[in-house]
């Protein structure tokens, strides 16, 4: 994961949408860690592990008005690669929610939206969904507060490991967050 170029206006828009999503599901103050599956469930999604190939992290399917996706009684489904670590699974769920919040309206075809995430594919939408996930799981103010509370003598790697454990996200996501927020 490396940081990507995005306009400040786009970043602000995504940050606001992530904060609005947390507020919509009832979070007044963001807990650490965010219960991302509860967030997804509150937005109407069923979430589960899926048998996917190694290069596929997850997928999202939305079929408005239908209540059957792959035999599951739902019109919104997020599937995550069952082989990923718990921290990565959390990030994948948040990433797929990012696709829904940010891209559903522009990409839905007659109420149907399906998207599969390949590890090798990184484009503007993927980067935006990653940024949404980071803001949902590690909101700027909360992340900065926790980062600033760490002892100064700790190195970048140690800080990343501690914050990854606290936010229950992959260490790579924390390192990318360092870059996004220009901390250190």
Segments and roles (model prediction):
Residues 1-184:
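Active-site hotspot residues in diverse enzymes, especially metal/ion-binding acidic/histidine motifs
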């Amino acid at each position: 994961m490396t940081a990507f170029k995005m306009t400040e206006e786009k970043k602000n828009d995504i940050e606001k949408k992530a904060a609005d999503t947390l507020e919509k599901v009832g979070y007044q103050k963001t807990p650490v860690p965010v219960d991302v599956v509860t967030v997804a469930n509150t937005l109407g999604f069923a979430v589960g592990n899926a048998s996917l190939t190694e290069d596929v992290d997850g997928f999202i399917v939305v079929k408005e008005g239908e209540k059957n996706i792959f035999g599951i009684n739902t019109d919104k489904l997020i599937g995550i690669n069952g082989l990923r670590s718990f921290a990565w699974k959390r990030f994948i769920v948040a990433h797929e929610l990012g696709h829904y919040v940010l891209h559903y309206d522009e990409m839905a075809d007659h109420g149907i939206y399906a998207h599969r995430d390949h590890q090798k594919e990184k484009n503007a939408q993927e980067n935006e969904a990653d940024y949404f996930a980071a803001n949902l799981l590690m909101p700027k103010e909360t992340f900065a507060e926790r980062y600033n509370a760490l002892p100064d003598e700790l190195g970048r790697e140690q800080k990343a490991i501690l914050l990854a454990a606290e936010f229950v996200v992959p260490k790579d996501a924390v390192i990318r967050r360092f870059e996004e927020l220009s901390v250190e």
